């Protein structure tokens, strides 16, 4: 069996790891360190570590791989292939050179578009109608190696980061399973990326999460679904942050300053943008409160909202 080092961290990576465990010999798993989670800051292992522990696989968790003791230990292993999927760190050249068959990455975009750490978020924020999975050889430069295989998938109007993450996670494992035989046998024909067509999806920053109501409704809608269910787009109402998990676009002929609540229905809070498409907030969370449907919030506040300004 092919001896593989797997490197990954979040839920996206777990389906790939499960497939590799079933089909090959995973001799080591490298993931990020445990992190404090929640209000009580409970130290929590990353999803990939939980899978590795279930199968009693050796786990390495360097804070930074370059120059680490864990790297020195990995370099002593007899390995055929390194597979990464959303690991979260660049690999040192010494590690890239270690496996006999090279190092490959499962990336959640149609490269060269959306290189970087947040390709699913950015594709939805940009209003793309499709994205996909790329299996590529790894090089020193971020997400720039030769493409081995790709498969596209449609982004539906009602998709958000959560739904696309789940679809792409399954697609990534399936495409890798199809692609691995040609990599192992040395029969694949990889294709260089066209760097002139490269775009980048940097990790989401806090300032990327705030909604600018002065944009067209479609852009606001795409931002909301491109950040849901994490890290979540937000606005401010009455000096209180308001997270928006779900919304829809509605046509309006009411002319109002962008960010103004122009109407409420039984199920939504309708907010003006800078064009004739308003945003209907359906699922929300006020700071310090539990997440709730707008319908539940409106049962006690419907008559007091129209005319308020979100900023």
UniProtKB/Swiss-Prot annotation:
E.C. no: 2.1.2.9
Function in brief: Attaches a formyl group to the free amino group of methionyl-tRNA(fMet). The formyl group appears to play a dual role in the initiator identity of N-formylmethionyl-tRNA by promoting its recognition by IF2 and preventing the misappropriation of this tRNA by the elongation apparatus.
Example of a GO cellular component annotation carried by this entry: cytosol
Catalytic activity from the UniProt record: L-methionyl-tRNA(fMet) + (6R)-10-formyltetrahydrofolate = N-formyl-L-methionyl-tRNA(fMet) + (6S)-5,6,7,8-tetrahydrofolate + H(+)
Record InterPro entries: Fmt, Formyl_trans_C, Formyl_trans_C_sf, Formyl_transf_N, Formyl_transf_N_sf, Formyl_transferase-like_C_sf, GART_AS, Met-tRNA-FMT_C
Matches recorded under CDD domains: FMT_core_Met-tRNA-FMT_N (cd08646), Met_tRNA_FMT_C (cd08704)
MF term (GO), any: methionyl-tRNA formyltransferase activity
Positions with a binding annotation for (6S)-5,6,7,8-tetrahydrofolate: 109-112
Keyword ATP-binding assigned: no
Gene name of the encoded protein: fmt
UniProt name for this protein: Methionyl-tRNA formyltransferase
Pfam families given in the database record: Formyl_trans_C, Formyl_trans_N
Key words, A-Z: Protein biosynthesis, Transferase
PANTHER family assigned to the protein according to its UniProt record, in alphabetical order: METHIONYL-TRNA FORMYLTRANSFERASE (PTHR11138), METHIONYL-TRNA FORMYLTRANSFERASE, MITOCHONDRIAL (PTHR11138:SF5)
